[in-house]
Amino acid sequence: MSDSAYQNHLSILRKRFDQALLETDFDGVILASGRLTYYFGDDHSHPFHPYAMAQQWAPFDLMPDVFIHIQRGETPRLLWPAKQDFWHVVYPIPEGGWCDQWRVEPVSSLQEWLPQISGKTAWIGPEYNEAPGLNPNLSVNPEALLHRLNYQRAYKTEFEIDCLWRANQAGAAGHKAAQAAFLTGKSECDVYRDFLAASGQLSNQEPYPGIVALNENAAVLHYEKKNPLKPDAMRTLLIDAGAAYGGYASDITRTYTAGSGLFAELIERVNTLQLSIAAQAVHGKAFSELHQATLAGVANILHETRICSLSVEAQLDKRIPQVFFPHGLGHLLGLQVHDVGGHQQDKTGTLRKPDESAPFLRLTRTLEKDMVITIEPGLYFIPMLLDNMVKNIAGHGCDLDLIETLKPYGGIRIEDNVVVQEGRSRNLTREAFSALLA
C-alpha cells in the first residue's frame, strides 16, 4: 500500500476531526485504544481489540494503552506505551514513512502527559477511571462529538477501501479452503481450522467469530458451535467468516451443497438474486428499497420453485418471505463488522429506525459514494419460524411436504462486501474470489 494513500487518509481524518471539534466547541480530543480486560476472578485476559476510532488513525494494529491526541490545527500525537517487562512482549514503535506525519512520544503512564494537556478536551474510547482526576478539562465520550465522528465513518477513504480489499483477499482464500474441506467430508471443527490456516489468522484475530454450519445447523443464523464430529451425511456447508487487515474487516458468507436437486437450484437462485441486488447498490439508492427488492426476490424464488403457490404480491402482503429470510439485507462495514452509524441520518445523531416489516435492518441510510456495505440475502428453513407460519398465517400457500425435504439442508446465505459508487458498485468479494483463479 502506498504511503500517499495513507497520507491522504490522514489528511481527510484531520479535516473531519477539526471540523467536528469546532462545531462542538472542543479544542482537542484524546482517542484511547483501550486496556486489557480480564475474566472474572482470573488473571487471564480477554482477546484485545482496539477501539475502532483510535485504530482508524493508524496504519498498523494498535496495542493496549495507546493514545492519540488531536489538537485542532496541530500535528497529531501518538502516545506509545514505553514499558519495561520481562513477562510479556514489549512492542516497539512501528517504523515507516507514516511517522513523518506524527509526533510520536513514548510514555510510561497517564500521569506523565495527561495533566499537561490544555484547553477543553474530549476523551473518546474506553474509560480510564483515573483520567478525569488528572485533567479537569476532560469531557468523557461527549455525544455531540461522537455523533459527528460516527456519521463520517461511513465514508471510506482510498486507504480504507484498500484495507477492506486486502481483508477480502484473505477471507476468500479461507473460504476456498473451507469449500474443499467440506467436499472431502471434514467436520465443522476441521473446516474451521482449514479456513483459519488459508486466511492466515488465528481465531482471536478474526474480526468476528466465524460461523461454520453443516446441514440443519445452517438454519441457525448465528450458529456458534463447531462440532468436531462428522455428520452422517454431508448435505450443506454455510460458512460466514472473514479476515482483517489493518483493523478493517471482511464479512463473507458462502453456501455449498454436495449434491444436485432442488437445494442446489435454490443456492444458484439466491446467488443470482444477490448479484442483482449488489449491482443496484449505487449512490442515491435507499438501502431500505434494496431490502424490499430482496424480499420480492425471495418471494419470486419461492413461487418459481413451487415452495409457495402464492403470487409474489400475495406473499409480500402476508409476509411470507420474512419466514424464509428473517434478517436484514446488510450493514455498513469497516473497522467494525457492523460498523457504526447505520441508522444515523445526519451528523447531529438523528436516527431512523427500520419499519416493522424489516425490524432487524441495520442500515436505513441512503447509500452514498464510498460507503462500504454487505449484501447478504438468505433463504432458510427454520423450524420455529415455519411452525409460527403454519399457526398464524392463514392461506400461507406453502408446500409443507416439500419444505420437510429441505429442512435437513438448513439454509442458504450468500454475502459480499460492496463499495458504493456513482452509477455502479464495486464488489470486493467477487473480485477477491476471481483473483484466486488468476
Curated annotation (Swiss-Prot):
Mn(2+) 1 binds at residues 251, 331, 376, 415. One of its GO terms (cellular component) is cytosol. Keywords: Dipeptidase, Hydrolase, Manganese, Metal-binding, Metalloprotease, Protease. The gene is pepQ. Splits dipeptides with a prolyl residue in the C-terminal position. Its EC number is 3.4.13.9. It comes from Hahella chejuensis (strain KCTC 2396). Its cofactor is Mn(2+). InterPro entries: Creatin/AminoP/Spt16_N (IPR029149), Creatinase/aminopeptidase-like (IPR036005), PepQ_N (IPR048819), Pept_M24 (IPR000994), Peptidase_M24B_aminopep-P_CS (IPR001131), X-Pro_dipept-like (IPR052433), X_Pro_dipept (IPR022846). This is Xaa-Pro dipeptidase. It is an enzyme of class 3 (hydrolase). Belongs to the peptidase M24B family. Bacterial-type prolidase subfamily. GO terms for molecular function: aminopeptidase activity; metal ion binding; metalloexopeptidase activity; phosphoric triester hydrolase activity; proline dipeptidase activity. Mn(2+) 2 binds at residues 240, 251, 415. PANTHER family: XAA-PRO AMINOPEPTIDASE 3, XAA-PRO DIPEPTIDASE. It catalyses: Xaa-L-Pro dipeptide + H2O = an L-alpha-amino acid + L-proline. GO terms for biological process: proteolysis. Binds 2 manganese ions per subunit. The keyword Oxidoreductase does not apply.
